[in-house]
Amino acid sequence: MEYFDYESVAKEAGILPDKLEALCKLVRQEFPFDDMMYELHLLRACMAIQQGHTTIDEALRSEEAA
């Protein structure tokens, strides 16, 4: 089941597929059993990148540190 269309936002934000995959893996570690929270956090991260609040590289670093 898909809750949020984070992939479209990621595409609009210019996030490369390999970077999105890396972000997905990191977020999945935080929410291994909760698909809705997993997708919500991905959507929020992609929106922050799209709006210029952060970059994909910064998002990957901050997720790794969490």
Where are these predicted regions, by residue range?
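Long, compositionally biased
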Residues: D35-A66
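N-terminal acidic leader/helix
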Residues: M1-F31
